[in-house]
């Protein structure tokens, strides 16, 4: 079972927007050393929308090769084209990914039936474990619990990243699906509470900069040690909030640059973190002990 703290890994870039393979390797080592339980390569935090297909697969391949089976690698292969999602999912399987994460199609706003058929088609086309990803605040496409329930009956659809931050919604999903269907948080601030309801982990932005703390948080929550998990979460809350001072992954890439783990590259239409946000994010990092 894929569970625990799963980092939504950024994709490091140089100042011209080219992929920085040395920094990628450094980040993967950082997570292997700091207790991250799984790596999500080229999800939406990894700027999947602005990588071409060749770059997308090369990042996944390099992460898979470096991890070498020590922890699961989940490949982000979702998008708003069903055909392209099939292509990416098939390629991710070929380079050795353990599972794929598929965001709901953005912009084109499919109906619930369209969502069902989209994900069913990908699952039938590629025999690899697949995790649904619902983040309506970014996609303007909300996959309702009844649609999740229908999709959960497809053998290789194994779980969902529920990133609404709505615990009532998460509870409804948990109530509708079988016990072996994995429900993950995609919202760092509410992840502890979702796991205490029965969720199996957190696909995390904060884990990029505080992997050990997020791993400890997830382990405590999944053991049912609510007081310990909540105490860690309270300590991390300033960071959870500061990492969304601007659109993700702008703040988290700046934070990693500040920590000396990567350069200062990001791709348009995203831009580097605004100067007015530097000190608030720096202060949050210091509060949480990730920056001296």
From Swiss-Prot:
Keywords: Amino-acid biosynthesis, Cytoplasm, Diaminopimelate biosynthesis, Lyase, Lysine biosynthesis, Schiff base. Its main location: cytoplasm. Its EC number is 4.3.3.7. CDD domains: DHDPS (cd00950). It is found in: Cytoplasm. Pathway: Amino-acid biosynthesis; L-lysine biosynthesis via DAP pathway; (S)-tetrahydrodipicolinate from L-aspartate: step 3/4. One of its GO terms (cellular component) is cytosol. The record marks 44, 107 as: Part of a proton relay during catalysis. The keyword Cytoplasm applies. GO terms for molecular function: 4-hydroxy-tetrahydrodipicolinate synthase activity. The active site is at 133 (proton donor/acceptor), 161 (schiff-base intermediate with substrate). SMART domains: DHDPS. Pfam families: DHDPS. Pyruvate binds at residues 45, 203. It catalyses: L-aspartate 4-semialdehyde + pyruvate = (2S,4S)-4-hydroxy-2,3,4,5-tetrahydrodipicolinate + H2O + H(+). GO terms for biological process: diaminopimelate biosynthetic process; lysine biosynthetic process via diaminopimelate. Catalyzes the condensation of (S)-aspartate-beta-semialdehyde [(S)-ASA] and pyruvate to 4-hydroxy-tetrahydrodipicolinate (HTPA). Homodimer. HAMAP family: DapA (MF_00418). This is 4-hydroxy-tetrahydrodipicolinate synthase. It comes from Ectopseudomonas mendocina (strain ymp). The lineage of its organism: Bacteria, Pseudomonadati, Pseudomonadota, Gammaproteobacteria, Pseudomonadales. The gene is dapA.
């Amino acid at each position: 079972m894929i569970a625990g703290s799963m980092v939504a890994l950024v994709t490091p870039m140089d100042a011209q927007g080219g992929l920085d393979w040395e920094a990628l390797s450094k980040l993967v080592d950082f997570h292997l050393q700091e207790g991250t339980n799984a790596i999500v390569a080229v999800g939406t935090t990894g700027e999947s929308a602005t990588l071409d297909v060749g770059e997308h697969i090369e990042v996944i391949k390099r992460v898979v090769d470096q991890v070498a089976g020590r922890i699961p690698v989940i490949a982000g292969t979702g998008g708003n084209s069903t055909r392209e999602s099939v292509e990416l999912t098939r390629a991710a399987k070929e380079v050795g990914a353990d599972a794929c994460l598929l965001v709901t199609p953005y912009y084109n706003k499919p109906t619930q039936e369209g969502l069902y058929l989209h994900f069913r088609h990908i699952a039938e086309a590629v025999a690899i474990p697949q995790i649904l990803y619902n983040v309506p605040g970014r996609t303007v496409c909300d996959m309702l619990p009844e649609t999740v329930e229908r999709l959960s009956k497809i053998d290789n659809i194994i779980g969902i990243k529920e990133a609404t931050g709505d615990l009532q919604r998460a509870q409804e999903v948990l109530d509708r699906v079988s016990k072996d269907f994995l429900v993950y948080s995609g919202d760092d601030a509410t992840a502890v509470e979702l796991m205490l309801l029965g969720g199996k982990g957190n696909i995390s932005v904060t884990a990029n900069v505080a992997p050990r703390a997020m791993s400890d948080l997830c382990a405590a929550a999944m053991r049912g040690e609510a007081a310990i998990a909540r105490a860690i979460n309270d300590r991390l809350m300033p960071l959870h909030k500061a990492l969304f001072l601007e659109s993700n992954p702008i703040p988290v890439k700046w934070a990693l640059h500040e920590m000396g783990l990567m350069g200062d590259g990001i791709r348009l239409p995203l831009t580097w973190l605004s100067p007015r946000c530097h000190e608030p994010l720096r202060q949050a990092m210091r509060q949480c002990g990730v920056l001296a």
